[in-house]
Structures are given as C-alpha cells and as structure tokens.
C-alpha cells in the first residue's frame, strides 16, 4: 500500500525547510521528481549514532541514484551540534532542518532514526526501521535477518514490489 503525500503541502513544507550548508536559505533539493530517502535524526540518540555506518554504506550503494537526506526536527539542536555529529561519525549527509516540525508531521514521523523512502511521485514506498537489529527498544538481535530499507531500495531499482512497505520504528522520540 502506497501512502501518497499531498504534493502541494509537501512542496510548501520543503520550501520552508533549510539546509545544513546554508541554514538561512530554503532547502529546495527535495523539490524535484526523483526518489529520495529521508532519515529522521537526533545527534544525541544512541541508535542514530549506531546507524551512521549503515547510512554511509547505503549512501555508497544507492546514493548516486537515490539521494539521502537527514532531517533534524525542532530547535533543540544547533547547526553546530548537527555538524559536529556528522563530522564525528564521518557521515556525508545533507541535512534538512525542520524547526517547526512541518515535515515531521506530514510524514507522521515520531522516532529517530526512522527512515522514509519516497519515490519521484512523492509516494512513501517504505517507512520505519533500517533493519530488524532491534526486536524492541533495548533488545538487540545477535544477527540481522531483515534489511528493510536496503531491500526496498533494491526492489525499486529493478522495478519489483517492495515486500515490506512499513515497519514500526524503534528508537528515540522526536522532541
């Protein structure tokens, strides 16, 4: 089942968001007709820190075709704190600041690190966990057996149906 974002609202929201490279100007990188991955981030969330390597690997594997963006909602984190997080974990991710939670609310995002894979028509093809490493908060699996986002990206590339379009995100609450 695809979740269709209201394109008008999506574009209006994106017009108000700001980028990490110049937080005083609107970020228009997402206002295009291409697929994209949005990762809800919080620099203090231990799970966001744990998944930085996975984000980098996915960006290496898919980033030429499908751009990745980090989304930092609210005003709790300064651009300096976000930049420090990106540098500490060597994460080459463009950041979209969402100070008024507009994008967060449009996506119905509640958790970091929650991921959204959105196609060129702004349909949400996948949302939720990166993988099944966490069975629940505080309980980790010994072995990952499901790579939800990676599998969704692979399916998209070959035009196949995405087997698992949604999982329940586990992590830190967006504040």
Positions of predicted regions on the chain:
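Short, thiol/selenol-centered motifs that function as redox-active sites or metal-ligating centers
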Residues: 42-51, 75-76, 170-175
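Structural microenvironment flanking redox-active thiols in thiol-disulfide oxidoreductases
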Residues: 49-88, 99-106
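Thiol-/selenol-based redox modules, centered on thioredoxin-like
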Residues: 119, 124-125, 129-175
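C-terminal motif of bacterial Sec signal peptides marking the signal peptidase cleavage site
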Residues: 16-19
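Short, internal strand/loop/helix patches
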Residues: 86-119, 124-125
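Bacterial N-terminal signal peptides that target proteins for export
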Residues: 1-9
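Short active-site neighborhood of thiol/selenol oxidoreductases, capturing the structured segment around
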Residues: 31-49, 153
């Amino acid at each position: 089942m695809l979740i269709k974002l209201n394109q008008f609202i999506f574009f209006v929201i994106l017009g108000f968001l700001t980028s990490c490279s110049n937080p005083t100007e609107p970020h228009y990188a997402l206002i295009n007709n291409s697929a994209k991955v949005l990762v809800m981030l919080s620099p203090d969330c231990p799970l966001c820190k744990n998944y930085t390597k996975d984000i980098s690997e996915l960006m290496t594997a898919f980033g030429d075709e499908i751009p990745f963006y980090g989304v930092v909602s609210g005003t709790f984190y300064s651009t300096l704190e976000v930049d420090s997080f990106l540098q500490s974990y060597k994460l080459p991710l463009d950041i979209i600041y969402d100070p008024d939670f507009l994008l967060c609310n449009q996506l119905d995002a509640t958790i970091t690190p929650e991921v959204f894979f959105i196609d060129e028509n702004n349909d949400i093809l996948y949302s939720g966990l990166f993988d099944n490493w966490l069975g629940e908060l505080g309980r980790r699996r010994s072995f990952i057996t499901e790579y939800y986002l990676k599998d969704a990206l692979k399916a998209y590339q070959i035009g196949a149906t995405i087997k698992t379009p949604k999982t329940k995100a586990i992590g830190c609450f967006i504040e």
